[in-house]
Design a protein with these regions (language model features):
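Structural motif marking the loop-to-transmembrane transition
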Residues: 1-4, 8, 62, 66-70, ...
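Structural signature of hydrophobic alpha-helical transmembrane segments
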Residues: 1-3, 32-50, 106-118, 146-156, ...
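Transmembrane helix exit motif
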Residues: 53-59, 83-96, 109-137
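Membrane-interface alpha-helices at helix entry/exit sites of multi-pass transporters
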Residues: 37-44, 66-71, 170-182
Length: 205
């Protein structure tokens, strides 16, 4: 039953965010965190995110502006690795407090507090009307890539920042979508490599 719920949620969220270009992590990661440890939830969300973007790559990948992809995705991939390593570090810290809820033992950890804060911030950004007008000068594209990649690696939340920094890059609508998809895949591959190595070393050895 749990697997059915997880698969259904992943399918529905992927469909809802297909055209927006962002929001999948904000919606899906908290749902996964109900069933898995937070770091595993972030990794599982990354797998769905990558699969979703590979599907979109087949549709719009050829329309991407690869000059912009390089400017955005190179710093994004580097900082995604750093963010993913930081996620692993936080996951290994000692719980700050313990309590019981509905007969189950629960803990308060630095990682949970950080992720909860970031979910709240990104949710507010994505829901606030002013966010629709939020855009940055094209010269800040590498900075946008770095920020998007870092928060993507740490929490899986990256799409809102990616869109805000690419929307004024002078791209046609199709090129914007294609560029966003290719950039997201680069980040996903970078962070999933770190998640895979750190998860294997921590849980399977």
């Amino acid at each position: 039953m749990v697997y059915l719920i997880i698969c259904t949620v992943a399918l529905v969220v992927s469909a809802l965010t297909l055209f927006s270009g962002f929001g999948l992590g904000t919606l899906l990661m908290p749902a996964f965190a109900v069933f898995f440890p937070v770091e595993v939830a972030v990794g599982a969300t990354a797998v769905v995110h990558l699969a979703n973007n590979i599907f979109k790559l087949a549709l719009v990948g050829k329309m991407a502006d690869y000059k912009v992809v390089v400017k955005f995705a190179v710093p994004a991939s580097i900082l995604a690795i750093i963010g993913a390593l930081l996620l692993n570090y936080f996951a290994g810290t000692t719980p700050l407090a313990e309590y019981g809820f509905l007969g189950k033992p629960c803990t308060v950890t630095i990682l949970k507090l950080v992720i909860a804060f970031l979910i709240a911030v990104f949710a507010i950004l994505e829901l606030h009307p002013r966010f629709e007008k939020l855009a940055f000068n094209p010269r800040y594209i590498p900075l946008g890539g770095a920020l998007s990649g870092f928060f993507g690696g740490l929490s899986g939340l990256q799409g809102a920042l990616r869109s805000a920094f690419l929307v004024r890059a002078g791209l046609a609508k199709e090129a914007f979508v294609g560029t966003s998809v290719v950039s997201a895949i680069v980040v996903d591959l970078s962070r999933l490599a770190v998640y895979g190595v750190t998860f294997y070393s921590k849980h399977l050895t």
